[in-house]
Amino acid sequence: MQRRKLQITLISPKGPLYRYRGGIFKQSLRYMPLTLPTLAALVPKEIDAKITCIDEGIGDVDSNLDSDLVGMTVITGTASRAYELAAHFRSRKIPVVLGGPHVTLVPEDAQPHADSIVVGYAEDEWPRLLRDFAAGRMQSRYNQSEDFCLSGYPLPDRSVLPRWKYSTSNVFEASRACIHNCEFCVVPAAWGRKPFKKPVQAIVDDLRRQRARRAIFIDLNLISDKEYAAQLFEAITPLKIEWYGLATTMLCDDIPLLNLVARSGCRGLLMGLESISKRNLRQSSKGFNDPEKYPQIVARLHERKIALQGCFVFGLDEDTPEIFLQTARFAVDARIDLPRFAVVTPFPGTELHRRLEREGRILSRNWEKYDGQHVVFQPLQMSVEQLQRGTEAAWKYAYSWSHVSERLRYSAAPWHVALFTNLSYRYYANRLHQFYNCDWMSSPLWREPAPIAATPDSAVIR
């Protein structure tokens, strides 16, 4: 008699803003995430399993799905959705495992909603959990080992997600963590400041296996370890790829490294500029940013045909109602190729959250609103609604037709990339108001979701 395969379902939940059904985009403009392909590749070979992966950004979750185990990766903005899905599957006697940044930041919040949680990176603990589950002894919690490193693990299995539903599947990761300690950042709060690095040859092998001509590196700070970064850039130069990634503004102070970045094929970088106020930056422990140097940073990148996605946050303590248009105008005048704006979010477990909690300024613990576009705390020098509407105004100013057309003329990005990204962000800017509603502030406590009825006529969990 043939033994039945273990049915494992891996889900990446999404909040209302980015969900496939009812979200801001009719189709995904995202690149393929690496979490689900990584988790799928980590399933031990000795476990005969059928793995199903569902990304709610591109598809629906079937309420009647058949599975022996459901695993979900959770960020704070998707926690309420993850808990809703977990309650549904557990009501059907399907065990649920939760992991990811939110679970690592506040495991005590996630534990009641799951049969087991994984705290920290999953490379060691996810396979151990699966072996325990197969043997009937799954524990309630698995913690990342102290001697964790990123060597010796299988490459992500990108076949578990439909490539054609993403802008690209050529997504790669060389390192994790960041050496800085910015007050509002999740990374040092969840995983510390020690960079974890994959062997450079493993990255080269993955790029070759994917036959990538263009690539996105999702490392939060590619230059956390400059020596390692230089080795990586030297190694990928012969591949003659175009690549995009993330770095800090400090890269532009290191001209030899910046030249190597350009020579290796970099065509675009995301940098957290955050604010045009030096006092804001100092308070946020990001004093290495200097707004007076931002135009120089843009110029140095453009000289090397590297485009800049510059990210700003609003709601820091020095911000007044004038900051929104000041920042948007600055972004346009500085010729930033792709400005991006967000409401500063005090994610649980971060130093910012602890400070605002002490000051009595946290207004909501409805995790669904912790998405970078909703206000969940009391700003110091403006109202909640001013912060909410001002952020929307900055988006609309920066992505007016006149400013989009101006950017297309000077952008360092390839023309088709500049056109696609600017039109996508213009679309986003003009639909944000659909998701802005300050009425929820009158009820800051989390509303419990209604039970989901699993019936043949309603097989999609909305």
Model segments located where?
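Radical SAM enzyme core and accessory elements
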Residues: 2-10, 17, 48-53, 65-68, ...
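Flexible glycine/acidic-rich beta-alpha junction loops that bind and position SAM and/or redox cofactors
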Residues: 13-20, 108-109, 180, 227, ...
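Short, electropositive alpha-helical surface patch
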Residues: 62, 67-76, 230-236, 240, ...
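Structural recognition of alpha->loop->beta junctions
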Residues: 109-128, 260-270, 326-341
